[in-house]
Amino acid sequence: MAKVTMRQMLEAGVHFGHQTRYWNPKMGEYIFGARNKIHIVNLEKTLPMFNDALNFLGGIAAKKGTVLFVGTKRAAGDLVAQEAKRCGMPYVNHRWLGGMLTNFKTIKQSIKNLKDLEVQEQDGTFEKITKKEALMRSRQKAKLELSLGGIKDMRAMPDAIFIIDTGNEKIAIQEAKNLGIPVVGVVDTNNDPNGVDYVIPGNDDAVRAVSLYLSAAADAINEGKGSITTAVEGDEFVEEKAEA
């Protein structure tokens, strides 16, 4: 299963927390000390917790489950979309709309509207209506794509959510907890780890650190998916031998 190393985390700056005056005491057990008024995360604690989280995500993928990637702050958005697409998982990288999980029925209707508009744009409908109406529909489609494009193929509740910056995604965490959906999250020294099932203590601001979390998660998920193929091929091989 995909694993990260201490060297990778050091090079990515995972150990740099926030200014000491902003710390959350609940993160105290994961803090090694302070340097220049910046808390330093204890990577000896992060390493096994990060790898446990990766094993969990890979296990979900191995069972054909779904992991929803969530990271809506600007520094993470593009990377969230890139890595979620790489492992074929849904994502939210613009803004978390209240009810995305707890009111999924309504969200699915909005997704249907988005898909209808996509069809209209492709089948020439936009060319048959007035320019004003076509412009309105085009703007509506762009707005829906921004908010829902990453989850438009998500047909049911995810089996877990993977969050970059738990302090920025409190609504998503609360909705997941209300529905009993496990939460994997990067928790910096200024945030509250409560409500996160798989805590990854570390820097949630540095682009290199965010990239490491996301690429490692995508690798673990792809490996998990690969194990499905291997298992199926193994079963077929056994059946062929039995027939022979």
Curated annotation (Swiss-Prot):
One of its GO terms (cellular component) is cytosolic small ribosomal subunit. SUPFAM superfamilies: Ribosomal protein S2. Gene3D superfamilies: Glucose-6-phosphate isomerase like protein, domain 1, Helix hairpin bin. PROSITE patterns: RIBOSOMAL_S2_1, RIBOSOMAL_S2_2. GO terms for biological process: translation. The keyword Protein biosynthesis does not apply. GO terms for molecular function: structural constituent of ribosome. InterPro entries: Ribosomal_uS2, Ribosomal_uS2_bac/mit/plastid, Ribosomal_uS2_CS, Ribosomal_uS2_flav_dom_sf. The keyword Transmembrane helix does not apply. Keywords: Ribonucleoprotein, Ribosomal protein. It comes from the Bacteria. Belongs to the universal ribosomal protein uS2 family. NCBIfam families: rpsB_bact (TIGR01011). This is Small ribosomal subunit protein uS2.
